[in-house]
Amino acid sequence: MAQQGPNPIEVYESVVKALMPVMAGVTAAQLNSTTPCTEWTVQSLINHALAVQVFGTSVLSKTSPDMASMGNVDHALPSEGAEAAFKSITDTTLATLKSANLEVTVKTSFGEMPGGNFIMIPITDMIIHKWDLAKATGQSATIDNALAELGIQVLTPAVAGGREGGFFGPEVIVPASASAQDRLLGLSGRTP
């Protein structure tokens, strides 16, 4: 069956393009700052963002993905720095996406699914954490409306299980007329 919805490669490129300047805008003085992810500092959040992309690449390339590594975030940033490390891993993930048959089923900790559907999970992680990182470092936290809508679409069927697993806090209720960004943030347990 063909991939339904937006082109995962184009969406991945768009999300990386949105997150890259936020990564670049983080200063060394901000690394110990708190984030909307209350258990993580800016440094921990960056390490998580890097680990999620490594995990995504491992799943798509059918190597041995380590789900636990995404939570192992209390260590120094890579020696090349956050921006360079993020560019390197997202370039690797993008190359993997471009070479993979995204209709082929991959085994994930979330169950079996086509690779094109799976990559939407790390994409949504980046969409949400772009906001977290921007808020924590005083940068523009605006999420593109189409990406926010995509995040809602991906997160809605998975959020209950994510809450049970401790990945999301309780939903923050926002008005029905709220922007897609605010609805995504509320759904993911964040106060817009």
Which residues does each predicted region cover?
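Structured surface interface patches that mediate subunit assembly and partner/cofactor docking
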Residues: 2-14, 18, 25-38, 58-70, ...
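Glycine-rich loop at the start of a catalytic domain that most often binds anionic cofactors/ligands
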Residues: 48-49
